[in-house]
Amino acid sequence: MKLLTLNTYSWVQTADPSLFAPLVADILENQYDAIALQEVNQLSTGPVINDPVGYHATQNEIPIKENNFAYFLVKALAEKGLAYQWSWVPCHVGYDIYDEGIALLSKVPIQSVEQVQLSASNDFESLHTRRALVLETEAAAFVSVHLSWWKDEEENPFLREWASVETAVKNLRSKKPVYVMGDFNNPADVRNEGYDLITNDGWQDAYAVAAARIGSATVPPAIDGWEGNELSLRIDYIFSDQPQAVETYEVKFDG
């Protein structure tokens, strides 16, 4: 099985779709079984797309808009002959003009999708609102997340959010493998915080067990949300609830 997780930061720095050609090419080459995406944006004022091909909705309040990044990506891949089924969950307003959310793409048929509330805040206008997307196929379940920092304005929202993820997948874990993928905003080398919480709960980090590793850090210093940070960080993960043999772990698109 091949998996990919990516914080796309889509459309914020550029509206030129050609700049995402390397991502499309990489997916075409690797034929990932499942892809988790974060910061999947669409212009709030964009035209609505009715019945997008392959789309499985979890809610009806915020429809798919014309420049939804997951929709753009699925279309670009379909034009090259690679079909994905997919889902998208809107989380909160981004940069005042976007509906920002998370997405999952699956190469095999989707059995079910679910939107899970993680944060105490459920206000779409609040940047503190966090949600997860749970997608189930016949063979496995996948979760896309974009979680809070360990400490955010002197509070610890991460504890609540991770507990909500575990509650959401509790019943699935007895049926099939579960993979939680995404941007966790918690560095792997910081002890007694988010990373240790997850691994101590029995989740396996793909990087930690990979037979071969190409790269480590997933973000450079001083990105949005980590202003003032001077080090490259590993904050994006693929966790599995069961021990898995991992042949290769590779960092891509880390700029």
Sequence positions of predicted segments:
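His/acidic metal-ligating clusters that form di-metal
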Residues: 131-143, 155-191
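Metal-dependent phosphoester-hydrolase catalytic domains
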Residues: 170-178, 186-255
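Surface-exposed cleft-lining segments at the edges of enzyme active sites
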Residues: 10-13, 116-124, 146-157
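Conserved beta strand-loop-helix elements of the APE1-like EEP
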Residues: 72-80, 96-113, 227-246
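Active-site neighborhood of phospho(di)ester-bond hydrolases with catalytic His/Asp-centered motifs
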Residues: 35-38, 87, 179-183, 205-209
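Beta-strand-turn-beta hairpins that frame and shape the catalytic cleft
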Residues: 1-4, 97-102, 106-112, 127-145, ...
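N-terminal, active-site-proximal structural segment of metallo-dependent hydrolase catalytic domains
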Residues: 1-98
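Active-site environment of divalent metal-dependent phosphoester hydrolases
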Residues: 11-13, 42-44, 94-97, 150-153, ...
